[in-house]
Amino acid sequence: MDLSNLTLTKIQELVLTKKCKIYDILLAYKNNYELNKDINGYIEFFDDSLEIAKRYDDFLRNCELEDLPLIGMLIAVKDNISIQDKSLTCASEILKGYISPYDATVIKRLKNKGAILIGRTNMDEFAMGSTCEFSYYGATLNPLNREYVIGGSSGGSAAVVAAFQAPFSLGSDTGGSVRLPASFSGILGFKPSYGGLSRYGLASYASSFDQIGFFAHSIEDIALILKHTCGADKMDSTSVDIFDDFYPLKIESLQGKNLAVIKELGEDLMDKNVASSFAKFKFDLLSKGINIKEVSIEEINFILSIYYTISPVEASSNLARYTGLCYGKRMSENLSLNDFYFKHRSNFLSEEVKRRIVLGNYLLSEGYDSKYYSKACEILQNLIIPKFNKLFESCDFIITPTSFVKPFRAGLDFDDPVKMYYSDICTVIANLIGAPAISLPYSKDKEGLSIGMQIIGRSKKDFELLSFSKNVIRELGLNGI
């Protein structure tokens, strides 16, 4: 048996029936990492995870599973989620050397229930990017074809799962940063409803949209980890309870479900391979008795403009704290305070991060706030969110391709940020309206590159979305472990 080709639930089954040790399974994943380090999915593999695995093996020798429902579950973590006594750099030179003094709420909940954190993963610096090429630690490669990007910003978390260097990983999703790399690497990528998981301990990019998300090979794994990490948290006033009676996930017919397709996201806008895959996806669903209707949402044309107005404004505020005085790397030069700030941030932040900070400050400057930022917030709250709420009164889910484009060749788009931003057009919808969404691996092109399909659910109905997705995978025979 290949011990590095398992779901979390299968790992726990083997461990609890004494057929395998946690240590041996973890070692198999570590060996895969050692053999394929060039993928650059991990910034750091935690050596102490092997000691923790040994300790849990000893514990299981004498005890039964009760208070540790996640024992033996191995999870990699994106480098913008705080783990006590571990480095936290957000893949930026400006935070080099910073050690987190506390656990994020999601991390604390995982640890308290027996999960083992096995490493921190690469990302676009401060989660700003769609390719995972904007990292201080270098680009992460796509395990399916190393000449192509993995997608971002959570590319490292996607890569370690796709390359069987971890069975499960945490990422963060602000505008598609979990779903896009999941689509590009042929695995599942799930973004919960806004507030479904506490953001306490997640380094902030755009606080109105940021959400911790999951990568996996199994819907059941996603549902299990969501069950044990979701819920309100006193450390995050935006967190909410989302657990519902759709868990445990049930096997049900797809017959009679109502799906919506957005007219303005037409196939003429897509790469031809994506368009043909999406057409086949719709045909497959129709053949299972699902109803699909095309709806017009003219406001969809504002989606990217709104996202790339609000998110850099919030980023410029959130990243103002990285001055060199409190966190991470610090210069020793004798400068005035303003000169110190200027030189420190100029030297240790990447061009993409500086681009978004400058844009955010410009949009907040006198005379432009009401013209751009306030107007974007007004359109989002008064037009877009109500329009989608109305749509969900007559449909169960919305389907789109995860991305209009296939994975593109690495290194091609550094000088064309607008083209990179365009890859988010389908995924930002769920972030703007606070809804759960998932990317399912659906097809591959002749180069072996993956094309994913996205399903968006109702806000705070995350388990309903996962249940439906499980049945789509089952009835369409989509590949998985």
From Swiss-Prot:
This protein's record includes keyword DNA damage: no
GO BP annotations listed: translation
Reactions listed under catalytic activity: L-glutamyl-tRNA(Gln) + L-glutamine + ATP + H2O = L-glutaminyl-tRNA(Gln) + L-glutamate + ADP + phosphate + H(+)
GO molecular function (one): ATP binding
InterPro entries: Amidase (IPR000120), Amidase_CS (IPR020556), Amidase_dom (IPR023631), AS_sf (IPR036928), GatA (IPR004412)
Matching PROSITE patterns: AMIDASES
Location of the active site: K78, S153, S177
Keywords recorded for this protein, A-Z: ATP-binding, Ligase, Nucleotide-binding, Protein biosynthesis
Top enzyme class: ligase
Hydrolase keyword on record: no
Job description of the protein: Allows the formation of correctly charged Gln-tRNA(Gln) through the transamidation of misacylated Glu-tRNA(Gln) in organisms which lack glutaminyl-tRNA synthetase. The reaction takes place in the presence of glutamine and ATP through an activated gamma-phospho-Glu-tRNA(Gln).
Family designation: Belongs to the amidase family. GatA subfamily.
NCBIfam families in the record: gatA (TIGR00132)
Protein name per Swiss-Prot or TrEMBL: Glutamyl-tRNA(Gln) amidotransferase subunit A
